[in-house]
A protein has these predicted regions:
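N-terminal Rossmann-like NAD(P) cofactor-binding module of classical short-chain dehydrogenase/reductase
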Residues: 80-83
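A generic alpha-to-beta junction signature in SAM-dependent methyltransferases
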Residues: 3-5, 74, 86, 99-100
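C-terminal hydrophobic helical "lid"/dimerization subdomain
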Residues: 22, 64-65, 72, 93-97, ...
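A local structural motif
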Residues: 33, 78, 154-158
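Mid-domain Rossmann-like dinucleotide-binding core that forms the NAD(H)/NADP(H) cofactor-binding site
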Residues: 1-64, 68
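Glycine-rich phosphate-binding loop and adjacent beta-alpha segment
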Residues: 45, 51, 56, 89-152, ...
Length: 195
């Protein structure tokens, strides 16, 4: 909703976590003609899930240049909306290059990097790009998302990749934080009934 996706838009989503996947399935009913989503090698299962959620094309940024892919896939038109939920400063910089003039960039991922802003500003101004921050969804957006899920019977439960018992809450938090080798949850849940 924050990106203002409308009929026929080309949308790029940077980051295939639960926010990125949610943006993917929300973009189709909003009217997006093409939906692109990026990730890295370890995101392969998430990128496959993104295809089920409506992504037209997935992009492994360790193997392909996102700007080149977007130029090719849009016949040089570039994107109307880019949503960055990766929090990766390099992805944010690439995002601007994937947008055409007078388009919209939504930032929903925190970087902690104070050096990105000065580098972006001139491109945003010259290309008249609207910059929209997004920290959380409002009530209207949440209600709309729930309606979409209910009406389309969308398989959002497939985002849940790990379920932990209550007595493993610390392990769950470490897994989410990337501290457990070989464990890379898309969405993790705690089920107190498991122990």
């Amino acid at each position: 909703r924050r990106g203002g996706v409308k009929m026929g838009d080309y949308v790029l989503i940077q980051g295939p976590g639960q926010q990125g996947l949610s943006c993917t399935f929300a973009s189709k009913p909003a009217g997006a003609a093409k939906i692109f989503i990026t990730g890295i090698g370890r995101d392969k299962p998430r990128l496959e899930l993104a295809k089920k959620f409506g992504a037209t094309r997935t992009i492994n940024v360790e193997e392909e240049d996102v700007v080149e892919v977007i130029r090719k896939e849009t016949n040089g038109e570039l994107c109307d909306v880019v949503v960055d939920v990766s929090g990766n400063p390099n992805a944010i910089l690439k995002s601007v290059d994937c947008l055409h003039r007078q388009s919209t960039m939504v930032l929903g991922g925190l970087t902690g990097d104070t050096t990105v802003t000065p580098m972006l500003m001139d491109k945003l101004v010259w290309n008249e790009i609207k910059l929209q921050g997004c920290f959380t969804a409002d009530n209207d957006a949440t209600e709309a998302a729930l309606r979409i899920i209910e009406e389309t019977k969308f398989p959002v439960q497939e985002m849940v990749s790990h379920v932990f018992p209550l007595n493993e809450i610390e392990h769950c938090i470490r897994a989410i934080g990337g501290e457990v080798p070989g464990t890379f949850p898309t969405k993790a849940l705690i089920n107190p009934a498991l122990g």
